[in-house]
């Protein structure tokens, strides 16, 4: 990769900052010659790999990973009318094999319900087959007609983790929804990204679902980014695809289902929430490199310093850290710039003075310096990284809290959504939602709010004055 030495735009100019950091920090290359399709740089893919490693570890507790085909026959795809209505304008169709027109067109999956559920109907026979919890990490395709943006709005979603579960009763499926919500909370806690959970309005739920719970974070420009969804499907799809089981009494019953997904928007959230004017700031849990060692070479002690740095690298690698010794023939300042841009959580400096004092200097990506005893360096670095991670969590929570405003009038709501999320009272009607949205140029994104940063209450609807409860209003990506 060509070395970047330019200045990153200030993060307060978020759109420009975001576009620049994707290539300066080597996350994604946007120059692929198809709109809405992008290429992961190795460094960006390393972040994705570690983040999805966390996600897979969480999923593997009680889900099994699988893989379904990319192509879906039109005959299966068109079976669930409400579901198809939500996706029909976004589907890519394969109509030819070579020069031959296909008898049945094939859809490139926009999501996999219509690929997976016909197979579930074959696999599930008895109540002893339930619950069934499977997931896959795949690419999906949607013909986005809106402005595409790397990691945020794509025509090829390269990292779609979708889970599909089947249960004997509605109550068990509803309990699985709560389990999925808890899992997503744990995932984003690990990424140090604060989220607000809420129930999407009926007109904005997943097509074919009874209801949808979504996880949103607030971006630096005040817009919300949906970074996870959990859908209660009820028995809609099981009736369409004949997913039945024999209960303990020998009777045939329709199953109940859930599905839930996360995409590379999770990486966009990490980039946007934690990054600063110097570049990426990566939580240790998702950083491809946790520690970079920079030798400070002065005078005639070059070989001694490099040997000491190499010994430190070997010790840290042996202790399980993702570590790299940067022994390139460059000024230390140029190395600092390089690794700060890429978000490495911790830089360790080793120079002649440190060797003489039997110490090393650890510099967190936040700029905080700590002198560590060389003899206890593994424990010291473990402690510094843990503190760094907690600092990221607290800073992200404080930034989110500052972007949440309670509003009692449409005027206050309009002002609040310019820089963040407004919490208003809403009666739940679509008519009032449309009035609010037209007045403030933002959307009702959810009610039944779950966040310790928001005090939920009842009060008069901001649009009609009738009985209402807390709801979120925001500009969205």
Curated annotation (Swiss-Prot):
Keywords, in A-Z order: Aminoacyl-tRNA synthetase, ATP-binding, Cytoplasm, Ligase, Nucleotide-binding, Protein biosynthesis
GO cellular component terms attached to this protein's record: aminoacyl-tRNA synthetase multienzyme complex; cytoplasm
GO function term, MF aspect, one: ATP binding
The EC number(s) this enzyme carries: 6.1.1.15
Highest taxon in the source lineage: Archaea
InterPro entries the UniProt entry points to: aa-tRNA-synt_IIb, aa-tRNA-synth_II, aa-tRNA-synth_II/BPL/LPL, Anticodon-bd, Anticodon-bd_dom_sf, Pro-tRNA-ligase_IIa, Pro-tRNA-ligase_IIa_arc-type, Pro-tRNA_ligase_II_C
Reactions accelerated catalytically: tRNA(Pro) + L-proline + ATP = L-prolyl-tRNA(Pro) + AMP + diphosphate
SMART domains, alphabetized: ProRS-C_1
Places the protein is found: Cytoplasm
GO biological process, one term: prolyl-tRNA aminoacylation
Disulfide pairings: none
UniProt cross-references to SUPFAM superfamilies, sorted A to Z: C-terminal domain of ProRS, Class II aaRS ABD-related, Class II aaRS and biotin synthetases
Pfam family, one: HGTP_anticodon
Comment, domains: Consists of three domains: the N-terminal catalytic domain, the anticodon-binding domain and the C-terminal extension.
Subunit text: Homodimer.
Protein purpose: Catalyzes the attachment of proline to tRNA(Pro) in a two-step reaction: proline is first activated by ATP to form Pro-AMP and then transferred to the acceptor end of tRNA(Pro).
Family: Belongs to the class-II aminoacyl-tRNA synthetase family. ProS type 3 subfamily.
Name this polypeptide is given: Proline--tRNA ligase
């Amino acid at each position: 990769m060509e070395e970047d030495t330019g200045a990153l735009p200030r993060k307060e100019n978020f759109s420009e900052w975001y576009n620049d950091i994707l290539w300066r920090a080597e996350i994604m290359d946007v120059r692929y010659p198809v709109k809405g399709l992008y290429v992961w740089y190795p460094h960006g893919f390393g972040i994705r790999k570690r983040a999805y490693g966390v996600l897979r570890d969480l999923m593997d507790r009680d889900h099994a990973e699988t893989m379904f085909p990319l192509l879906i026959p039109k005959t299966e795809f068109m079976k669930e009318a409400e579901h198809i209505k939500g996706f029909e304008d976004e589907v890519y169709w394969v109509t030819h094999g070579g020069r031959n027109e296909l008898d049945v067109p094939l859809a490139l999956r926009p999501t996999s319900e219509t690929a997976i559920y016909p197979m579930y109907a074959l696999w599930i026979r008895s109540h002893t087959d339930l619950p069934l919890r499977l997931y896959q990490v795949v690419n999906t395709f949607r013909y986005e007609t809106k402005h595409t943006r790397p990691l945020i709005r794509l025509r090829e979603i390269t990292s779609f983790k979708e889970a599909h579960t089947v249960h004997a009763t509605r109550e068990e499926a509803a309990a699985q929804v709560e389990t999925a919500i808890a899992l997503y909370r744990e995932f984003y806690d690990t990424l140090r990204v604060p989220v607000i959970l809420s129930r999407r309005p009926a007109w904005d739920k997943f097509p074919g679902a009874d209801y949808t719970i979504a996880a949103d974070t607030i971006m630096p420009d005040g817009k919300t980014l949906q970074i996870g969804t959990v859908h209660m499907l009820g028995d809609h799809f099981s009736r369409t695809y004949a997913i039945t089981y024999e209960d303990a009494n020998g009777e045939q019953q329709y199953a109940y289902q859930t599905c839930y997904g996360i995409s590379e928007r999770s990486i966009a959230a990490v980039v946007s929430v934690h990054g600063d004017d110097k570049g990426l700031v990566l939580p240790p849990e998702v950083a491809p490199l946790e520690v970079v060692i920079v030798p400070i070479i002065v005078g005639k002690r070059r070989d001694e310093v490099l040997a000491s740095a190499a010994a430190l690298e070997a010790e840290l690698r042996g202790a399980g850290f993702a570590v790299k010794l940067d022994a390139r023939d460059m000024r230390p300042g140029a190395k600092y710039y390089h690794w700060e841009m890429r978000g490495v959580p911790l830089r360790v400096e080793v120079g002649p003075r440190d060797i003489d004092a039997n110490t090393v200097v650890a510099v967190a990506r936040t700029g905080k310096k700590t002198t560590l005893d060389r003899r206890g360096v593994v424990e010291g670095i473990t402690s510094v990284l843990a503190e760094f991670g907690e600092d990221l969590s607290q800073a992200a929570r404080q930034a989110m809290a500052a972007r949440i405003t309670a509003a009692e009038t449409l005027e206050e709501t309009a002002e609040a959504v310019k820089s963040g999320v407004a919490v208003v009272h809403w009666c739940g009607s679509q008519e009032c939602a449309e009035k609010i949205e037209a007045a403030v140029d933002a959307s009702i994104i959810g009610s039944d709010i779950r966040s310790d940063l928001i005090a939920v209450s009842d009060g008069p609807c901001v649009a009609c004055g009738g009985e209402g409860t807390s709801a979120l209003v925001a500009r969205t990506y």
